[in-house]
Amino acid sequence: MPREIVTVQLGQCGNQMGAVYWQRLCAEHGISSEGILEEWATEGGDRKDVFFYQADDEHYIPRAILVDLEPRVINNILASPYANLYNPENIFVSKDGGGAGNNWAQGYSAGERIYEDIMEMIDREAEGSDSLEGFMVMHSIAGGTGSGLGSFLLERLNDKFPKKLIQTYSVFPNAQEGDVVVQPYNSLLALKRLVNHADSVVVLDNGALARISADRLHVQTPSFDQTNQLVSTVIAASTQTLRYPGYMNNDLVGIIASLIPTPRCHFLMTSYTPFTSDQIDKAKTIRRTTVLDVMRRLLQPKNRMVLTTPSKTACYISILNIIQGEVDPTDVHQSLLRIRERQLANFIPWGPASIQVALTKRSPYVTTNHRVSGLMLANHTSVASLFKRMLDQFDRLRKRNAFIEQYKKEKMFANGLEEFDDARATCDELLKEYKACESPDYVSFGGPDGDQS
């Protein structure tokens, strides 16, 4: 029996990503922009009801909740050909429409005001599921709504549904060129909630997305649409084994359990290959896609969707490759042997050094130019360099108490700035834990003789 997942899209970024993701899911399941199953979509074998449910008139509706504090992006969705796909009762735009002013504290306070409206939608979706497995949250952590309101909702979802999984797709800001001056504050405050209240966080680093888009598309500055197509391809591929199930990894808990051996280190990187013009406008083609070729490309640092600082000690904690297409399992076995012989992947010294592979069939309704494609979900210690970058940027602002007044206007910061210090400490502990994973005695980390209690 399929276990349903409710998607919560927050803010400008979350709703832009979500809109393209649902277009992609509709295409992969033979569902029209109005939610009607196409006459030619007769293949079966897919599980639509993990992410969709059927209305009384049989058309398919995403199990999605769209929330924003300003109306522009949701208005665009409602003016698009997919306007009738969504349940109008599951769309929330703040009445004053003023947004969160790129301020985490404003977004968080807005959460307290609109909590009941949003929770009513979430409860309705949860109750409409036969066997809810969990939530997927799409957001950015740089601005106000995705980071602040996102933080508030993560806390509440965790309180209200303690046994349900929460997987986030979180866009981290581009370190080089952020358009929000206070993004180091917003990001760190949101990161604390991602550490404490999410079971798994797929890290999408804007800097890396821009670099991969530029590399694949031959353009200096890729458009928002192109970057969102990139992201939606990755999100759709990461849910492929839930929608086209095989023997393993056919529910969220199976995927998370195989990737996250210790609870705090749950920040995952992704690589995908090949990106082609089927998915992204103007993508250059890759001629050859054997299983070995795809698996080798997935391990190349330049294909990772997180910009990390190279380090000799960095290593994989776990890898899950989701390979799509008509693939012979012997090819997979041979490819894994070749990768091991050439030592293309460096693993932690205290755990199993193996690449897990999930084979999944591809949607019969989407034609592609390539035989095999692959997504890698990896837990890698070099993600610590992303947290280090965030800490350094935060410290630079905090040292001067720059822009603090904007935060003090909100209730949470009215009596002091402990929340900032607490968020910084959480990030620092996370950084230390990922670094500790690189040493053989990590197993005693956090014990009486370890670094933390």
UniProtKB/Swiss-Prot annotation:
It holds the Pfam family Tubulin_C. GTP binds at A142, G143, G144, T145, G146, S147, G148. One of its GO terms (molecular function) is GTP binding. InterPro entries: Gamma_tubulin, Tub_FtsZ_C, Tubulin, Tubulin/FtsZ-like_C, Tubulin/FtsZ_2-layer-sand-dom, Tubulin/FtsZ_GTPase_sf, Tubulin_C, Tubulin_CS. Gene3D superfamilies: Helix hairpin bin, Tubulin/FtsZ, C-terminal domain, Tubulin/FtsZ, GTPase domain. Its main location: cytoplasm. It is found in: Cytoplasm, Cytoskeleton, Microtubule organizing center, Spindle pole body. GO terms for cellular component: cytoplasm; gamma-tubulin complex; microtubule; spindle pole body. It comes from the Eukaryota. Keywords: Cytoplasm, Cytoskeleton, GTP-binding, Microtubule, Nucleotide-binding. GO terms for biological process: cytoplasmic microtubule organization; microtubule nucleation. Belongs to the tubulin family. Tubulin is the major constituent of microtubules. The gamma chain is found at microtubule organizing centers (MTOC) such as the spindle poles or the centrosome, suggesting that it is involved in the minus-end nucleation of microtubule assembly. This is Tubulin gamma chain. It comes from Coprinopsis cinerea (strain Okayama-7 / 130 / ATCC MYA-4618 / FGSC 9003) (Inky cap fungus). The gene is TUB4.
